[in-house]
């Protein structure tokens, strides 16, 4: 997936991002066309990238939230009590999803190690986070303007 923010972040880290179709990635790693790839642990294990790469660094530079969404029409049709149930179910779903993602990642890291990959976890994540944040804002400043970016930054 070619994502402008990811491209800017990796360029800022000194890499030369090379977007390509995912089905081409394994052979590109195998042939040395690219030196690395960026994917969730579950994708790395499913693709058996341990066959074509030796290292994986768990930088935590991307967080992909999963939102629970509902239309105003649906929510407006619920009673106050039902909206409360909906909110409780959404929170429970979020907690269960996060727990499952963590479980899958832990199992995936173990599988990577079992298959000979060196998993690097002792990483100073602050520089990665700062570069990713800066890239996120810089990519969209021209499109939306500095004032909008500052309003977004102010949201907690």
Q: Where are the regions that the model predicts?
A:
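N-terminal secretory/targeting leader peptides
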Residues: 1-156
């Amino acid at each position: 997936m070619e994502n402008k923010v990811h491209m800017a972040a990796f360029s800022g880290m000194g890499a030369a991002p090379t977007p390509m179709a995912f089905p081409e990635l394994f052979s590109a790693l195998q042939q040395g066309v690219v030196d690395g790839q960026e994917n969730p642990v579950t994708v790395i294990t499913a693709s058996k990238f341990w066959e074509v790469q030796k290292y994986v660094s768990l930088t935590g530079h991307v967080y992909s939230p999963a939102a629970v969404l509902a239309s105003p029409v649906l929510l407006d049709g619920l009673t106050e009590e039902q909206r409360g149930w909906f909110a409780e179910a959404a929170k429970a779903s979020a907690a269960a999803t996060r727990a499952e993602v963590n479980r899958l990642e832990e199992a995936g890291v173990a599988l990577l190690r079992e298959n000979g990959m060196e998993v690097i976890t002792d990483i100073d994540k602050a520089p990665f986070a700062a570069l990713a944040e800066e890239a996120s804002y810089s990519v969209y400043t021209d499109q939306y303007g500095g004032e909008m970016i500052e309003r977004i930054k102010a949201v907690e």
